[in-house]
Amino acid sequence: MSKVYDWFEERLEIQAIADDITSKYVPPHVNIFYCLGGITLTCFLVQVATGFAMTFYYRPTVTEAFSSVQYIMTEANFGWLIRSVHRWSASMMVLMMILHVFRVYLTGGFKKPRELTWVTGVVLAVLTASFGVTGYSLPWDQIGYWAVKIVTGVPEAIPVIGSPLVELLRGSASVGQSTLTRFYSLHTFVLPLLTAVFMLMHFLMIRKQGISGPL
């Protein structure tokens, strides 16, 4: 086993990387409230895992979406548990994100030189809200349908570009299969990819600049 480790160590300098990760200075003022961002990340990872599991059974069509969710809840092995954990962790992710934003704001963590860290955090907050909007529609029940209809109708009030923007969101003049397909694509591919990219940027900047000091 040591020979295998030595082989990788010689080429990748694993020990140096491990030392850099584990020896990072943590300021003495850091408390449990500084863990809220990490909890938000944990919730996101749970979302990815449980969401991926449900894609094996979910069918993104207006005729089969609701029945496929019912199948997950009643027939698929541990499907009810996976979907429930997905919903609970979604609520927890939103709550932890809000508390994290408040903590950063109240402790002045957005000030120079951490402005870009704050900007990426705001983008992540918007992406998190977008997860909620797109995911809410996927069961395609009465609540999901009317929620999508209302949300996608909001841009209608914008002058000039309102109507084209509504049609872009819905995929057609009215809410239907095109809308569900777009929301499913956003929820399972576009938003997770963007979130992963901005999280990486967020953490790299925190790693580079360190945790902000006390007020």
UniProtKB/Swiss-Prot annotation:
Function, as annotated: Component of the cytochrome b6-f complex, which mediates electron transfer between photosystem II (PSII) and photosystem I (PSI), cyclic electron flow around PSI, and state transitions.
Heme is among the record's keywords: yes
Residues binding heme c: 35
Membrane protein topology class: Multi-pass membrane protein
GO molecular function: electron transporter, transferring electrons within cytochrome b6/f complex of photosystem II activity; metal ion binding; oxidoreductase activity
Similarity section: Belongs to the cytochrome b family. PetB subfamily.
Free-text cofactor note: Binds 2 heme b groups non-covalently with two histidine residues as axial ligands. Binds one heme group covalently by a single cysteine link with no axial amino acid ligand. This heme was named heme ci.
GO cellular component terms listed in the entry, alphabetical order: chloroplast thylakoid membrane; membrane
Note: Heme 1 (or BH or b566) is high-potential and absorbs at about 566 nm, and heme 2 (or BL or b562) is low-potential and absorbs at about 562 nm.
Binding site for heme b 2: 86, 187
Protein name in UniProt: Cytochrome b6
Transmembrane segments: 32-52, 90-110, 116-136, 186-206
GO biological process, one term: photosynthesis
Keywords from the UniProt entry: Chloroplast, Electron transport, Heme, Iron, Membrane, Metal-binding, Photosynthesis, Plastid, Thylakoid, Transmembrane, Transmembrane helix, Transport
Pfam families per the UniProt record, alphabetical: Cytochrome_B
Cofactor field: heme b; heme c
Quaternary data: The 4 large subunits of the cytochrome b6-f complex are cytochrome b6, subunit IV (17 kDa polypeptide, PetD), cytochrome f and the Rieske protein, while the 4 small subunits are PetG, PetL, PetM and PetN. The complex functions as a dimer.
Localization annotation: Plastid, Chloroplast thylakoid membrane
Chief subcellular location: plastid
Binding locations of heme b 1: 100, 202
NCBIfam families: PRK03735.1
InterPro entries tied to this protein: Cyt_b/b6_N (IPR005797), Cyt_B6_PetB (IPR023530), Cytb/b6-like_sf (IPR027387), Cytochrome_b_N_euk/bac (IPR048259), Di-haem_cyt_TM (IPR016174)
